[in-house]
C-alpha cells in the first residue's frame, strides 16, 4: 500500500490536465478518442451524454456523499478496496488490467480520487482521462509520453507502507 504524505498533498490540488468549467465543453474533444473516467459524476455525465467511457473508476460517492446512478452492467466489474489518501496494490493492478481490457468498471470500496495517477501510467497513448475537480469542473488529461512521465513523477510522491499482520502486531 502507498500513502500520500501531507507534504505532497498540495501537488494534487492542481489539475493534472486541462480544466473545463462545464461538461458540455469537454464533449467536443471526445469524438474518436478512447475515454477513461475517474469519479461518479463524470462517469454519470458521460453515460447521460451517450458517450460511455471505455474504463470507469467509481466509488459510489461524490464529495464524500453517497451518489447513486453509475451502472454499466455489460462491462467487466472489478471490486477493490482503497482508503482515502492512498493507493492499494489492488487498485494499481486493477488500473493496469482495465487499461488493457476496455469495457471495465473498477468499483472502489473507499475512495477513488487518486486513481487517476496509476490510470495515467497504464493508459495507452492517445487515451483521454476525465475526472472531476471539486468545485471547479472537469479535467481532461490527454495521455502523451510527457503526461505518462508526469504521472510516474507524481507516483513517486507516494510512500510505500506495510500493513502489519496480526502475528506481527502481537509478536506471535
Swiss-Prot record:
One GO BP: coenzyme A biosynthetic process
Associated pathway: Cofactor biosynthesis; coenzyme A biosynthesis
InterPro entries in the record: GTP-dep_dephospho-CoA_kin
GO molecular function (one): kinase activity
Residues annotated for GTP binding in this entry: 40-42, 59, 112
Reaction(s) catalysed (UniProt annotation): 3'-dephospho-CoA + GTP = GDP + CoA + H(+)
Domain of life: Archaea
EC assignment: 2.7.1.237
Keywords for the protein's UniProt record, in alphabetical order: Coenzyme A biosynthesis, GTP-binding, Kinase, Nucleotide-binding, Transferase
Function: Catalyzes the GTP-dependent phosphorylation of the 3'-hydroxyl group of dephosphocoenzyme A to form coenzyme A (CoA).
Family of this protein: Belongs to the GTP-dependent DPCK family.
Protein's name in the database: GTP-dependent dephospho-CoA kinase
Organism per entry: Methanospirillum hungatei JF-1 (strain ATCC 27890 / DSM 864 / NBRC 100397 / JF-1)
Amino acid at each position: 500500500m502507498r500513502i500520500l504524505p501531507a507534504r505532497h498533498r498540495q501537488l494534487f490540488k492542481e489539475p493534472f490536465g486541462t480544466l473545463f468549467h462545464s461538461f458540455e465543453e469537454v464533449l467536443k474533444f471526445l469524438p474518436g478518442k478512447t475515454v477513461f473516467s475517474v469519479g461518479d459524476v463524470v462517469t454519470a455525465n458521460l453515460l447521460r451524454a451517450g458517450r460511455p467511457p471505455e474504463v470507469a473508476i467509481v466509488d459510489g460517492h461524490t464529495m464524500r456523499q453517497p451518489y447513486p446512478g453509475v451502472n454499466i452492467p455489460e462491462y467487466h466489474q472489478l471490486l477493490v478496496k482503497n482508503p482515502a489518501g492512498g493507493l492499494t496494490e489492488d487498485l494499481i493492478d486493477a488500473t493496469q488490467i482495465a487499461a488493457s481490457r476496455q469495457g471495465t468498471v473498477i468499483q472502489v470500496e473507499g475512495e477513488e480520487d487518486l486513481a487517476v495517477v496509476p490510470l495515467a501510467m497504464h493508459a495507452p497513448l492517445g487515451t483521454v482521462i476525465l475526472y472531476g475537480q471539486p468545485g471547479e469542473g472537469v479535467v481532461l488529461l490527454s495521455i502523451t509520453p510527457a503526461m505518462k512521465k508526469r504521472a510516474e513523477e507524481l507516483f513517486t510522491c507516494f510512500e510505500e507502507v506495510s500493513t502489519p499482520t496480526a502475528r506481527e502486531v502481537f509478536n506471535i
